[in-house]
Amino acid sequence: MKSFLLARDWIDKSTTEFRLQNIRELFYTWAKDYHQKEARKLQFYSLDTVPEIEQSAAEWSKTHDNGAILGGFSAAARYAPTVRYQKAEIYVEPQFVQEFVKDLELQPVNTGGNVVITIPHDETPCMYAKPVHDTLVTSPAQTVIDLLGDAGRGEEAAEAILRREYPERTEDERRTEKGN
């Protein structure tokens, strides 16, 4: 793995440790590959507002083994609120989908929904979830990758998270760390 990252200039290797660099390029490349895999997305409608849906999902998740996690724009709003969004985006573990839909009284729709449930194609999106303001959300890395695959304002929201969570070090900072 380290040689893969080094070959693409995505790590700065010193004699005792290595650090990620060119993080923006790394995420854009990663997102391109990641979005070739298909996760199932289901659309629903709720009479509740998006913030109410997100709050209900967070409360539900606490009593269901963290089986529902905010992702996409819903997670981005917790990390770096920069864009408005109209839909609650929630990862729900496959074994919990039916119960989640029933408990939150969601109605399936083909278009015009205000809730998007993503059933992940692997465990990665939920594996590194973290609490932000008492709500479980996808990791900053997963959130960025999801947003980069989203048309519209996704890239803008992803860039805000990249700036906040993964600030690039300047060349001067790198030289100082190396002692040059």
Give the positions of each predicted feature.
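A short, conserved structural fragment
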Residues: 3-16
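Short, cationic-aromatic polyanion-contact patches
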Residues: 13-36
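Conserved phosphate/pyrophosphate-binding and hydrolysis machinery centered on Walker-type P-loop NTPases
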Residues: 20, 90, 134
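A conserved hydrophobic position in a structured secondary element of the catalytic/binding core
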Residues: 21, 92, 139
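A generic structural signal for short hydrophobic patches within well-formed alpha-helices
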Residues: 26-27, 97, 144
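Short, well-ordered secondary-structure micro-motifs
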Residues: 30-31, 57, 103, 128
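Short gly/ser-rich loop at a beta-strand->alpha-helix junction or flexible surface loop bordering the NTP-binding
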Residues: 37-122
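C-terminal regulatory/effector modules of DNA-binding transcriptional regulators
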Residues: 103-180
